[in-house]
């Protein structure tokens, strides 16, 4: 059987790994197409994981803030992609 404490610990580990990936993406030796978008998606993933961890701890207000952060990051992703698609016309 699993406990909520185990879930929180695993979510925190996933957040750490995800944030490390975001840092790696941000600091690539050679620039990559959509590097900025990949970084934002990764940060959004970390925010979603953080929200889940807060929910598992009964911290609904903090969870909502993290969800809003993820939403803002994903809005930025869509803005970049839509802008790039618009440039191709």
Language-model features and meaning:
Residues 2-89:
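Long, low-complexity or tandemly repetitive, helically biased scaffold regions used
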């Amino acid at each position: 059987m699993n406990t909520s404490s185990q879930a929180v610990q695993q979510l925190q580990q996933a957040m750490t790994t995800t944030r490390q990936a975001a840092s790696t993406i941000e600091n690539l030796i050679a620039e990559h197409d959509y590097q900025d978008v990949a970084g934002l998606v990764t940060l959004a993933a970390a925010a979603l994981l953080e929200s889940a961890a807060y929910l598992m701890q009964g911290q609904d207000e903090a969870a909502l803030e993290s969800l809003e952060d993820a939403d803002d990051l994903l809005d930025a992703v869509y803005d970049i992609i839509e802008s790039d698609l618009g440039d191709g016309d």
